[in-house]
Regions:
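Conserved GHKL (Bergerat-fold) ATPase module
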Residues: 1-208
């Protein structure tokens, strides 16, 4: 029942936690996020409520294959970030959803107050687990296919602020043909500036 009511309670709980340290301590293990993880019989989390499944952050981290990892993957827009989300899910990575306006302030607040959390949006970067590292053959001029594609795109865009990377990705047919990567800290600064200026956030000047 608590999970079913969470969407209505979440804004008040999150704002209250950010404004009152004692309240934050009391609710730290009660804060839920929708997750891509499947419910497991006999396990308390993820909790199924309607069409969604919910988890606490501590349970998320307990399910990580690397117990030393602090990284928590999150998605703010299931449609706009669909390619990156699908790619991570294809490698069995769990992703939480932080889609409300308050989450743009709540996640950085959690990082600042809880040393065990480090949040990374699904479209922030591509780590080794997502790359399909295969040796490439060079042509007669010594240029690989990746370098040829990179140069073609770079010439077409003609924008020095955009970094072009050509990489083979895992995921087979589900892998997106192209992605825009927005480095986490740069994007957060851009989003904060947009919030202060009361405008919709756009792409940072520099992106990949």
């Amino acid at each position: 029942q608590y999970a079913e009511a969470w969407e209505s309670l979440a804004p008040f709980v999150k704002i209250g936690a950010m404004e009152d340290d004692k309240f934050a301590d009391q609710v730290s293990d009660l804060i839920l996020f929708a997750t891509t993880a499947e419910s497991i019989e006999g396990e308390q989390e993820p909790i199924k409520a309607g069409e969604k499944r919910y988890t606490t952050l501590s349970s998320y981290q307990n399910r990580l294959s690397d117990p030393q990892s602090k990284r928590i993957l999150y998605c703010t827009d299931e449609v706009a970030q669909a390619g990156a989300l699908t790619l991570w899910k294809s490698q069995n990575a769990e992703v939480i959803f932080a889609e409300t306006v308050i989450d743009s302030q709540f996640l950085p607040w959690l990082e600042a107050t809880k040393d065990q959390y480090k949040f990374q949006r699904v479209d922030a970067e591509l780590d080794e687990s997502l790359r399909d590292e295969k040796p490439e053959i060079s042509d007669q001029d010594g240029e690989t296919q990746s370098e040829t594609i990179r140069n073609l795109i770079k010439d077409a865009l003609n924008n020095d602020k955009v970094t072009i990377q050509v990489q083979a990705l895992k995921g087979g047919e589900d892998a997106p043909p192209a992605m825009i990567l927005l480095p986490e800290q740069m994007r957060r600064m851009n989003d904060m500036g947009a919030l202060m200026d009361q405008r919709l956030p756009g792409l940072p000047d520099h992106h990949v």
